């Protein structure tokens, strides 16, 4: 079944080939995608890139692969770890309506499913290679983090 609009939520710290795989898979099921960039209000070692930086990574990658025209919008979503209802309300305000969501984050999926949102989960793409924790660690240890980013950002 083809849906009109889908939603992908992620931190994208940074946007890497695994995320590109998710976008490509999702676009097989929808006409347009909304990308919600989570943890927009957090800056720490697990969230080193700002929303604006992550949005640029996403746009550049999707433009390179001629997918940017399939993105309805890219929005920022702040974390509210103790208030799932408020988080979902903020998500709805920023994204508007969507028909389906895609992802593997069980906390996010639980919030969405408890509110009647259908979720499609895809197998993770080369998780041993494309995992944000490992990529961020490699960036931290590198004398030239830009080379590491080029290695992982599609």
Model-based region annotation:
Residues 1-154:
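Nucleotidyltransferase catalytic core that binds NTPs
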